[in-house]
Curated annotation (Swiss-Prot):
The keyword Mitochondrion does not apply. Belongs to the HIPP family. It comes from the Eukaryota. It comes from Arabidopsis thaliana (Mouse-ear cress). Keywords: Lipoprotein, Metal-binding, Methylation, Prenylation. This is Heavy metal-associated isoprenylated plant protein 46. Probable heavy-metal-binding protein. Residues 2-71 form the HMA domain. Gene3D superfamilies: 3.30.70.100.
Amino acid sequence: MKQKILIRVTMTDDKTRAKAMTKAVQFKGVSAVEIKGDHRNQIEVTGVEVDMIPLIQILRKKVAFAELVSVTKVEPPKKEDEKKGGDGKGAEGKGGDQKGGDKKGPDDKEPPEPKPVPCYPWPLQGYGVPSSFPHQGYGVPSTFPQGDGVPSSFPYPCHPAHPYNDIGEPVYNHEPNCKIM
């Protein structure tokens, strides 16, 4: 979620303003910093998933007293969908046989959904796994989920370090392309 954070910082000269902007841009998730306010004593920080409390604490510690003024969510601009040939279909419909007039183009197809990966128990020793479970020593199953028959570094999709095991934590914007306005 992209957000704008407005912070009032006690800044009296340009050197302090530059220092405050530098500290804000170095913070994780920040994409833009701008000086606002009548007295040029406010900083507007724009970014994705910016944690504002540590940002304010760093500004207080490194620059001067800072306080949170407001936090607003940035709405992405809505794009208007234009229908191709929407006006011309009525006039062409009266003119005789049309084959495939309502067919969907290749752009209208949705990509197929990925198949779910089966989740095998990890590890296989103990933890209530029945003894009739097929295995070949040391708790390694005879057939691996990848289907290659050779143990890999992550043989189980439920392994905590398996690449398919996404726990859904927020993703922070790690773009180094920050700009100071």
